[in-house]
Amino acid sequence: MDASSSDWPVHQLWPPSGDKRRTDLDIVLFHGLQLTANDINHAWTSTWTQRGHDNVCWPREWLPCDLGEAVRIFSVSYDAHVVTSPHDHVSEIADNLFQNIVDRRYKWQRPIVLIGHSLGGLVLKSLGGLVLKSLVVKFERESTIRSPSNSFSQATARRAKLFLRNVRGVAFYAVPHAGSTNICTYVNKLFRCKNRHHRGIMGTIKPYRRDMNQLSVDFDRIVTEYEINIYAFCEGRPMEQGILVEFSSAQQSARNNCYKVEDANHMEVCKPCSKAHPSYALLLQFIIDCGKVAREFDQALQKVHDLHQSTFENYPTFQVKWRYWCSP
């Protein structure tokens, strides 16, 4: 589905509609909370614009250029408005995305990198939990008597397994893995409402929720079992209510790399100023390392170092683990 379609939750940013070129890597973007009614329809592009240039969707304009165009880029759309969203939990959004992304529409036969901003990171973690659940169901079906009440088919489990095995990396931009009181306060003040964070989708952001803690535990299991590489970015510049997602909440786990984007607040952290900006250059390095198997990625890596050598000298880099892929 191309980016011009508004009635489908997954929009293809690259390659253009009708382009049948061979691609070697899939990237899927998950946007965060929405503050206006207009955001509901456009967050899948407006979240990922160059800072100061709202007409430039940087994943569409920059990544194909720097990755040799051998990439397929999707951006996911869902209603995550802080007040009017019909969803009470990220799991409801993830359930719909599971059906549209994993179970029905796309074949996931390439390396995959998932990228989430704010609430979008929790959505993709919940999606991963549903994928894992479908595999557990498959195992139980093969080990015990089949139950007609089980909603996951064998075909669904096969597609889910292929999806998980191809996820090479996940990048988080200011995701409140441990919740955020400041986001709740910010929304309450913005909409002049009290205790909004106790209701609807905002309840997901509330700190110390047992179900969200379990979501992180389940996601860590997936990361460990499938050797998925993680990189996180956190905001370095406060908004009116301060830092909305603290470093400790944005990190996901103590073993993950987490880079503080000093000149960006919560809304700007996923909006790089230029290709040389660390929030883009480090992400690009991460994507390239996750997609080492692709034909054009070694050339792309050299190109990145040539363009941004000073950036990589001044900011932390990281070593992505190699992994062994079993046959289906």
Where are these regions (language model features)?
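Active-site catalytic motif of lipid deacylating hydrolases and related acyltransferases
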Residues: 29-112
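Aromatic/acidic cage segments in peptide-binding pockets
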Residues: 43-56, 92-93, 154, 185-199, ...
